[in-house]
Amino acid sequence: MANTTETANLCGLKRENFQATINGKKTDLYILRNRKGYEVAISNYGGAICAIMVPDKDGKVANVIQGHDSIKQLMSGNEPYLSTLIGRWGNRICKGQFTLNGKDYQLAINDGPNHLHGGAVGFNAKVWDARQMGPRALALHRISSYGEEGYTGELDITVEFTFTDLNELIIEYLATTNKKTIVNLTHHAFFRSEERRVGKEC
C-alpha cells in the first residue's frame, strides 16, 4: 500500500524534503499509486501536486506536471500558485469588493488593486489535514474561519484526489458553510507536454 513512509518512488522525491512544522501543523509528502504502478505525489502544504509519473507517447515514464522539489521551494514565493489548490476564490475580484444580499464586503488586496486567488494567504499557503484512503486516494481538509482574507462565513472544505488505473487524476471538492458566502475552488495544476525531471528542465 502506498504511503508516506516509502522512501523509494518513481518521481525520486524525498519525503524528508517535504517535512516541516508550520504554525504547529506538520507537512508531508503523500504518494498515490495505481495498479499499473504509476504515481502521483502530493504535499499537504497547499495541496500541491509535486509529480505525476505516467508514460509518455513513447511509453517512457515521465513527470508530466510542473511541481516542486521540497517544502522550501513551495514556500519560496517565486511561484506561489504553481500546481496548488486555489481558494476561497480562484481568479481576480476587482478591487477585492463584492456584494452579497445587499451587504458590501472588502477582501484582502494582493494583486495591484485587486484580490487574487483567495488573498495574501490563500489555500495555496495553508497546511491541510491529510488522510490517505488506500493506495490511490488522498483527502485534504481544512476549515477557513470567518473573516479569513475578508470572507464572510466559516467554510469547511474537503478535497479528494483519486488516481485511477486509467492514469486519471480526479479532484473533487466539497465545501459547506454556516453563512451565505462566495466560493470558487480550483487547482492550479500546470502540465507539460514534454518530459520534466523533478527540479531540472530537460
Question: What is the predicted role of each segment?
Answer:
Residues 2-200:
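Surface-exposed acidic/polar loop and edge beta-strand patches at domain peripheries
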